[in-house]
Amino acid sequence: MFLTMMKGKIHRATVTEANLNYVGSITIDEELLDASGILPNEKVQVVNINNGARLETYTIPGPRGSGIISLNGAAARLCQIGDKVIIIAYALMEEKEAKQWQPKVVFVDEYNKIVKIKEKEIHGQTE
């Protein structure tokens, strides 16, 4: 049996662009993609902390070190510049692997610069 497990997460990123006239996707600073283990073109869930909206899209790498988090296409209707979002990728794995799995959780500051990287989440802690 395969389980769907959190693979990587970028926590409380700030939306820097919302481009309605783009084909689709979310553009993410390549440094954040690498740190979180999320790949270009990978399916992600985006959770908007400001309004509770949840959406699925795919990633496009943005310029390394730029801090870009851009919701593109229809997703731009669900996020505004300045909104805080959580970006999550999932992976399918066998139960045996899932029990040992440690996802990458990337915490960023208000400029989307990496503050800390953890391999697990603890209830009640935002960092």
Curated annotation (Swiss-Prot):
**Which GO BP terms sit in this record?**
alanine biosynthetic process; pantothenate biosynthetic process
Binding of substrate, residues: 57, 73-75
Q: Which Gene Ontology cellular-component terms appear in the entry?
A: cytosol
Q: How is the cofactor bound?
A: Binds 1 pyruvoyl group covalently per subunit.
EC class of the enzyme, as a word: lyase
Its keywords, alphabetically, are:
Autocatalytic cleavage, Cytoplasm, Decarboxylase, Lyase, Pantothenate biosynthesis, Pyruvate, Schiff base, Zymogen
The GO terms this record gives for MF are: aspartate 1-decarboxylase activity
Any idea which residues are catalytic in this one?
A: 25 (schiff-base intermediate with substrate), 58 (proton donor)
Among its keywords, does the record have Cytoplasm? Answer: yes
Checking Pfam families in the record gives:
Asp_decarbox
Pathway membership, UniProt: Cofactor biosynthesis; (R)-pantothenate biosynthesis; beta-alanine from L-aspartate: step 1/1
- Kindly list the positions at which Pyruvic acid (Ser) occurs in this protein: 25
Determine if Membrane is one of this entry's keywords.
no
Which cofactors does it use? pyruvate
Primary localisation category: cytoplasm
Reaction(s) catalyzed by this protein? L-aspartate + H(+) = beta-alanine + CO2
Modification after translation (UniProt): Is synthesized initially as an inactive proenzyme, which is activated by self-cleavage at a specific serine bond to produce a beta-subunit with a hydroxyl group at its C-terminus and an alpha-subunit with a pyruvoyl group at its N-terminus.
**In the Enzyme Commission scheme, what number(s) does this protein have?**
4.1.1.11
Localization annotation: Cytoplasm
The protein's matches in InterPro entries, at most eight in alphabetical order, are given as:
Asp_de-COase-like_dom_sf, Asp_decarbox
How does this protein assemble?
Heterooctamer of four alpha and four beta subunits.
Similarity remark: Belongs to the PanD family.
Instruction: Describe its function.
Output: Catalyzes the pyruvoyl-dependent decarboxylation of aspartate to produce beta-alanine.
Q: Which NCBIfam families match?
A: panD
Q: What is this protein called?
A: Aspartate 1-decarboxylase
Q: Origin organism of this chain?
A: Carboxydothermus hydrogenoformans (strain ATCC BAA-161 / DSM 6008 / Z-2901)
